[in-house]
A protein has these predicted regions:
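N-terminal leader/transition segments
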Residues: 1-168, 173, 177-179, 186
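Conserved beta-strand/loop scaffold segments within soluble protein domains that form the structured core
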Residues: 103, 110, 115-302, 308
Length: 310
């Protein structure tokens, strides 16, 4: 944990943040230092001791990233078969955005929004993300607009990073009667890194979100992805996982169905060999009447059972 404290201090020193932003990051760093990485004593991690997995697979983890210059885009990772919008992250840094096929007045993408909430959360990996992510991004889809083409977020790591903690946070807001088809495409050449991704979704009345997470390509990384979803009336969220490539992957969904006739669906296909561990944990809270949820996960090859709860 001393390594984290040293790297956090270095990160904070090199950042240009307001007092409120610094206080927010200090609060989350303190919480992470207190809790550390989750282990089997935590009920939510009884199937996967990520603390021991990181020690075994990575060893000493580096938390300081700085602004790497090694963020060139390998054109081979880009999909040419379908027309799509793009956000390209290389080693956790945003290197390209492209919404040229959309009505630009109907969407907003902010790449300089830092969170300043003063509350902490009971999830040490979210604390870690809040402490070290250099900024949090926001995508707004405005009222009555359906994004024409899917948004593919390319999560790329290259062979310039190893034993590195990479953190990314994006907030998505779908206003009334809007829709978004979002594809997370994981393409890693960097190995033995811990990649920590946190998404916040706010779905207003009659909005529709479809999120496809594709972890297809073989890599030695350890990955944690958390979707926090808040849904108003008549909104729909659907999350689909193709989970295969990473050495270890845990995907969590925490969803509040706050409005009547809102619904949430989680589907997944896991194709793993006996040396990999992938897990989904979905908690969907039905806070009002007349809401609906459904979960279905199928496995091939030898793996541990899914941990699911409603």
């Amino acid at each position: 944990m001393e390594n984290f404290k040293t790297d956090f201090a270095k990160t904070l020193k090199e950042s240009n943040l307001s007092e409120k932003e610094i206080a927010f990051k200090n609060l989350n760093a303190k919480e992470f230092s207190k809790q550390g990485f989750p282990n089997r004593k935590d009920e939510d991690w009884k199937f996967s001791d990520i603390n021991q997995i990181i020690k075994k697979e990575i060893g000493e983890l580096k938390f300081y990233t700085g602004q790497s210059k090694e963020t060139d885009i390998d054109e081979d990772v880009l999909l040419g078969e379908i027309k799509h919008n793009k956000l390209i992250f290389v080693n956790g840094q945003l290197v390209q955005t492209d919404f040229s096929s959309e009505e630009i007045s109907k969407i907003e993408f902010l790449d300089n929004k830092n969170d300043t909430e003063d509350q902490s959360v009971e999830n040490s990996l979210i604390n870690l993300n809040n402490a070290l992510a250099n900024k949090s991004y926001k995508l707004l889809v405005k009222k009555n607009y359906q994004i024409k083409n899917p948004l593919i977020i390319y999560h790329v790591s290259n062979n310039k990073v190893t034993s590195q903690n990479i953190n990314l946070k994006i907030n998505f807001e779908l206003e009334e009667n809007s829709s978004l088809k979002l594809i997370d495409l994981l393409k890693d050449k960097g190995n033995k890194n811990f990649i920590n991704i946190f998404y916040n979704f706010s779905l207003e009345k009659n909005s529709v979100l479809k999120n496809y997470k594709i972890d297809q390509f073989e890599n030695d990384n350890i990955r944690y992805m958390f979707n926090n979803i808040k849904q108003s009336s008549n909104s729909v969220s659907e999350t689909f996982y193709l989970s295969k490539g990473s050495t270890f992957s845990k995907n969590e969904i925490f969803c509040d169905l706050k409005g009547e006739h809102s619904s949430a669906f989680v589907n997944g296909v896991f194709s793993l060999n006996k040396n990999k561990h992938h897990e989904i944990k979905a908690k969907i809270n039905h806070l009002v009447e007349n809401t609906k949820s459904y979960q279905s996960v199928s496995y091939t090859h030898l793996t541990l059972p899914t941990n699911r709860e409603v």
